[in-house]
Amino acid sequence: MNKLPFQKKLLGTGGSRLGLSTNDTITVENLLYGLMMVSGNDAAVALAEFIGGDIQNFANLMNEKAQILKLTSTHFISPHGLDNDEHFTTAYDLALLTDYALQNETFLKIVKTPNYTININNHSKQLNNTNELLGYLDGVYGVKTGFTNGANRCLVSACKRGNLDIICVVLGCDTKKDRTKDSINLINYVFSNYSIVNIEDLIKIEFENWKKNNKNYFKINKSAEENLNIYINEAQIPFKHIAVYNSEINNISIIINISSYLEAPVLSDYKVGIINVQLPNTSSFTIDIINSITIRRKNIYYYTNMFLKDYFSLLTF
């Protein structure tokens, strides 16, 4: 693990601090714990200069990542987020960013840690996570508190109960008590009123049931084969799971529309229909139903072959 000497020029960083002094030596991992557990702005600047060379270049890297993650209402100026009119984000963008960050095992490990001992110059320092919901509210496993005079009290929480995993973002609270209460109320409301639905499985089950109940559905004019072999384009299903309000689960609509009459030849990969999916309070999406085999058109060879089959069957009889 890289060890960094803490430089004197970083001492002027305002806001909450890890408490580093000039020429302190600390590992990158310990800086990350100091950043995420106790909002160490001095740790943020030290990491930014280590990674980006300077604060401006690191801010540029953050803004590039924001574009990749489609954080359309976010712009970074600094690694610590102290008040600046050009440094801003939204609750929605913070949720997207948190969802991405939680996929990183190191990040996840740190933000779910209630207390941790770091070493500065080989001297131990105890850190206690400032996230008041960690270890207090059932299912909470992170992620970060925040405060500036401009933003007031903020908290991003991650919480999982059963198969429902949510991110809750509360911004602009006047007090820590308000931040805690609002977060708890929002989280409990979601788990009391929403369920996770595997929409991909629902679509597949509906489609397989349709095939089972409509084995002789297709009428293929001038066809040498009797039936199609159809499948759905699973790549068009935009997500596997969706959180749905409990009272609206039965309002999920999956409608299969397939043309019953076709004329040969029907090529493989030919679209024969669509599935319309309508979710509660969201826009619908469609999935193509595709034929997987080529259906040949009857021709002279087909009729000759059928004649010979019938002829020799009569001779055998």
Predicted stretch roles:
Residues 1-92, 98-105:
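Active-site-adjacent loops and short helices of periplasmic peptidoglycan-processing enzymes
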Residues 72, 86-88, 92-93, 98-317:
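Domain-terminus/edge residues, biased toward the C-terminal soluble/receptor-binding domains
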